[in-house]
């Protein structure tokens, strides 16, 4: 894509400081950007790189006198960058169905569907208009996927799964595998059949290698607008409310219910059968073992500190425990 600073400012509704004819052909960072590229400044930490940056233009929320490049001043830098990044994203290739894909004759494919080599579409599956199924994806019998969804390479979507429109499911995610249900009988663990499914709303993103178990009886539910990072484990019967975001490596045990607009930091762990209210936020590595009824920020665990300081802290903690 080739454009100029003036056109970008007009597109974003920004105020231009500099030559509107400045050519822009790509994007870059303050540290590593090159001539002809545009970047953004949304964190004061990176302002130190402005005077020496080679970028041709920068998105900022206020004028920076030390910046040698063209500046485009916008109200919301992150929103402006999202719009600009979309403009620079290469278009998808024309829709095509690979002859190496295996598609059951009873499956339904909407107009404009693309299916890559080695992908499998099971009996009775329903793939909505404009969906893109990457190579080696597996869509089981009876699965429904809403229009304009992207299913990444190696994704496994198993029986009794329904997915809304505009889903983005990244490589090697697994949706609808059996939940971790076992019963201890006569000195051994015996598996309990998992009879539910998975229901996923509209505009959901599911990261690479994330797993979502099907329900034991009722469905596991992922609400509209939910964003899940990579390597997340979601147990059976979990309900995640609309527009909740969960960062990588979080572990959510079975039957946890989240409200809407929750924010979960990386590597958080949730005990099963608890309820999280709307608007709760958890910092990374928090361990949540009880229901949360009030919105706000919650933390647990100890942040990193110098090793010697940690040893002294832990020694004092042991002494405190002995005193009690």
Model regions: which residues?
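Structural signal for interior beta-strand "rungs" in well-ordered beta-sheet cores
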Residues: 40, 96-306
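Terminal amphipathic alpha-helical/low-complexity segments used for targeting or macromolecular assembly
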Residues: 1-100, 112, 161, 166, ...
């Amino acid at each position: 894509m080739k454009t100029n600073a003036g056109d970008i400012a007009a597109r974003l509704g920004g105020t231009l400081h500099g030559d509107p004819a400045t050519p822009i052909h790509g994007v870059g960072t303050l540290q590593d950007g090159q001539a002809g590229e545009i970047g953004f400044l949304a964190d004061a930490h990176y302002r130190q790189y402005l005077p020496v940056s080679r970028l041709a233009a920068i998105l900022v929320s206020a004028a920076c006198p030390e910046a040698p490049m063209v500046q485009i001043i916008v109200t919301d830098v992150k929103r402006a960058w999202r719009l600009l990044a979309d403009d620079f994203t290469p278009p998808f290739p024309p829709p095509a169905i690979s002859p190496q894909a295996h598609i059951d004759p009873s499956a339904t494919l909407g107009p404009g569907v693309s299916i890559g080599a080695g992908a499998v579409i099971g009996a009775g599956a329903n793939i909505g208009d404009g969906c893109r199924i990457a190579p080696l994806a597996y869509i089981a019998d009876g699965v429904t996927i809403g229009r304009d969804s992207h299913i990444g390479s190696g994704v496994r979507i198993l029986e009794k799964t329904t997915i809304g429109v505009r889903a983005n499911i990244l490589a090697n995610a697994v949706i609808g595998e059996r939940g971790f249900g076992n019963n201890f009988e006569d000195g051994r663990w015996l598996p309990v059949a998992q009879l539910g499914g998975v229901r996923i709303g509209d505009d959901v993103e599911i990261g690479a290698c994330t797993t979502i178990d099907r329900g034991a009886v009722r469905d596991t539910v992922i609400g509209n607008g939910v964003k899940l990072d990579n390597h997340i484990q979601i147990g059976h019967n979990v309900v995640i409310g609309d527009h909740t975001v969960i960062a990588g490596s979080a572990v959510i045990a079975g039957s946890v219910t989240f409200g809407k607009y929750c924010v979960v930091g990386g590597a958080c762990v949730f005990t099963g059968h608890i309820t999280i209210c709307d608007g709760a936020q958890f910092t990374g590595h928090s361990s949540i073992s009880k229901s949360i009824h009030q919105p706000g920020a919650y933390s647990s665990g100890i942040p990193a500190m110098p090793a010697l300081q940690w040893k002294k802290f832990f020694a004092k903690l042991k002494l405190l425990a002995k005193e009690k």
